[in-house]
């Protein structure tokens, strides 16, 4: 990482061990970057390239003692080619209207978030998030963050929170209408972000971490090609083989 200001002032510490939120039978630790007020968009972009991610004002990366399951992944958008199911999802939802909104609380957004968590992640803890926890998670940011809502007519179908980096976009979180069981909103959301990257001439869409053992993350390896940060370098990954990020 660069050594000039403000990079030289960034400090890192390791958290105490805690139960892994992805693999419940494992113990995790995180490496946290501080102080938060110095982590602006240029600094955060460099941190993301080094495997970090953020949750609200908390910038971290996995720092586990005996596990390397978390692989930071990104899509090189120039090389991406959608498969048949992705083309179908794009066509199915072509009438969705995307609107950028202020990074501010909306009762309508929170209601959709609650429905999504209760349906897709029941019992995971986030389904119990109150308004304050929701706001801390998605509406607090020290970088260039966009909140985009997707509507079908007047009906809110999906919300995406996206960070703009110096070399791409980082998909922070997306939640959508869980009652439309035939829909492919999550796939469409990623395809939409890929198109935004291309339009802005940004080379990468960062998708956070991929864990081979986590079924909830299988969707990420359906986007080809996919690069992972493995042993300190970004390269194309083989989902059947790769898993260690360091």
From Swiss-Prot:
Its EC number is 2.3.2.29. Coiled coil: none annotated. Belongs to the R-transferase family. Bpt subfamily. One of its GO terms (cellular component) is cytoplasm. It comes from the Bacteria. It is found in: Cytoplasm. Functions in the N-end rule pathway of protein degradation where it conjugates Leu from its aminoacyl-tRNA to the N-termini of proteins containing an N-terminal aspartate or glutamate. Keywords: Acyltransferase, Cytoplasm, Transferase. It holds the Pfam family ATE_C. GO terms for biological process: ubiquitin-dependent protein catabolic process via the N-end rule pathway. GO terms for molecular function: arginyl-tRNA--protein transferase activity; leucyl-tRNA--protein transferase activity. It catalyses: N-terminal L-glutamyl-[protein] + L-leucyl-tRNA(Leu) = N-terminal L-leucyl-L-glutamyl-[protein] + tRNA(Leu) + H(+); N-terminal L-aspartyl-[protein] + L-leucyl-tRNA(Leu) = N-terminal L-leucyl-L-aspartyl-[protein] + tRNA(Leu) + H(+). This is Aspartate/glutamate leucyltransferase. It comes from Aromatoleum aromaticum (strain DSM 19018 / LMG 30748 / EbN1). The keyword Acyltransferase applies. The keyword Heme does not apply.
